[in-house]
Every structure is written in C-alpha cells, then in structure tokens.
Design a protein with these regions (language model features):
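Short hydrophobic beta-strand that contains or immediately precedes a catalytic carboxylate
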Residues: 176
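Beta-strand-rich binding/interaction modules
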Residues: 183-205
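Conserved alpha/beta catalytic core and glycan-binding cleft of carbohydrate-active enzymes
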Residues: 1-97, 179
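C-terminal beta-strand-rich structural cap/linker in extracellular carbohydrate-active enzymes
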Residues: 211-227
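Aromatic- and acidic-residue-enriched segments that line the glycan-binding/catalytic groove
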Residues: 95-107
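Glycan-recognition and catalytic regions of carbohydrate-active enzymes
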Residues: 27-32, 85, 92-97, 112-173, ...
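Short clusters of hydrophobic/aromatic residues that line enzyme substrate/ligand-binding pockets
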Residues: 1, 55, 106-108, 147, ...
Length: 227
C-alpha cells in the first residue's frame, strides 16, 4: 500500500506547483524514487481509506477541480487503484473527529433513510458531477492494458504543468495536469518523444486536440491524450 503517495495526494492538488518543492513537483520527486520498490506497478494506490481522513475533510461547495485532478491521477498513475466507498458522491470525513466519521454509512439502501444516493435523484448537482466523472474514467480504465500494465515515464514540472506517459507496445496515453490556478500555454517541444502524432483524442472532453507547438490548459486542468 502506497501510503506516502496517499499523504502527498491529500494536499498537493491544493498547492501551486513549481519546479522544485511545491504541488505536483512533490509527486514527481516521490515517483522518481520508485527504484526502491521491487515492483512499483504492484503497489496499491488510494486517495483515502477507513483509517485516514477522507480526501475531502469537509464536503466541497463549489468546483471539483481538485477532485477531478486527483481521480484522473489515481486512475492513470502506476500501481493498482483502490477507491473507498463514498468517494463517488464526495463523502467527507476528518480523522480529527474520530474514526467513526470516516466510516459513516453510505446514504440509502435502508428503510427510513431520508437520502438514497444509490439513485440519481438522491444526489445533488455536485455529487452527480463527481459520480458521472468517476464513472466515465472507470469505464474507460476497465480492461485498458496501457494503464494497467504500461511503463511510466514522467517529466519534471515545467511552468506548473506535470506531464507523464503510460506506454504498452505501440499504444500510449499522455496525461497533463496544470497544478496552478492560472491558465497556461504549454510549450510542447520538451515532450515530443511522447507525442507521436500531430493530434490526439482527449478522453475527458471527447475532442480531437491539435499538438502543434503549444497547448492551452485552463487553471487546474487535466487532459488525457490517447495515441
């Protein structure tokens, strides 16, 4: 179980990324030490579990950028992902308030439950957005050998953007994470070795993305390019 990575993921998606010691630069630094593991691909990777604070200590009230970046990373990084129940509906819990709050029942499924999050009408708009996002990623990942078995190559963050590739044979995906609260125009020249075509399908938007000299990313954006 990759507890060090879990610890990092609990806060790096909130920080402004630089090239050395903040935000996603800490992810880069940590994964660069994978040589200490006999087989890092067999590590269990997770955002939280029944013994840790949940990824959200309190339920978010606005955008889900932090959630979307973290979940996309969890499901594309090396290792075997584990998702704790309730993450799909943004269940929150702070270990400082006791372990019981980390293990609250999933809402619904029992007579007398006022809320039933097992059905779409039992989820609020933010929960629906989170559920739909996770569902799309999981359906894509199921049976995807590139993500499950592929090599992991990453680049030191540049201009606040962390880029990594998963590759298996002649198939690959490239993930781009903007670890800042600013829009970025990313120079693609340093990444040409992992960008084998002039365009790629971007999973989350469903759009075809041109890969010319640069690529625009919104604040806290995440892209998953398929080749």
């Amino acid at each position: 179980m990759d507890f060090p990575l879990t610890g990092l993921m609990s806060y790096v998606f909130d920080e402004e990324t630089n090239e050395w010691d903040r935000g996603l630069a800490k992810i880069y630094d940590y994964l660069s030490q994978d040589i200490v593991y006999a087989n890092p691909m067999n590590l269990l990777v997770f955002l939280d579990n029944h013994d840790t604070s949940r990824f959200y200590k309190t339920k978010p009230s606005s955008d889900l950028n932090r959630y979307k970046q973290a979940l996309a990373f969890l499901l594309t990084v090396r290792g075997i992902p584990q998702i704790y129940y309730g993450t799909e509906i943004l269940m929150a819990g702070d270990k400082a308030n006791g372990d019981g709050v980390l293990r609250n029942d999933f809402p619904g499924g029992w007579k007398g439950d006022k809320i039933n999050a097992f059905i779409p009408t039992g989820r609020d708009s933010l929960q629906t957005e989170a559920f739909t996002y996770m569902q799309k990623l999981l359906r894509w990942r199921a049976g995807n050998e590139v993500v499950a078995k592929g090599s992991y190559k990453h680049f030191i963050p540049r201009n606040g953007v962390y880029v990594y590739e998963r590759r298996l044979g002649n198939r690959s995906i490239v993930v781009l994470l903007n670890g800042t609260d600013e829009k970025k125009m990313l120079d693609l020249a340093p990444y040409r070795e992992v960008l084998p075509a002039s365009s790629a399908n971007e999973l989350l938007s469903g759009k075809s993305i041109r890969l010319d000299s640069s690529l625009f990313l919104s604040a806290r954006d995440v892209m998953i390019l398929e080749f």
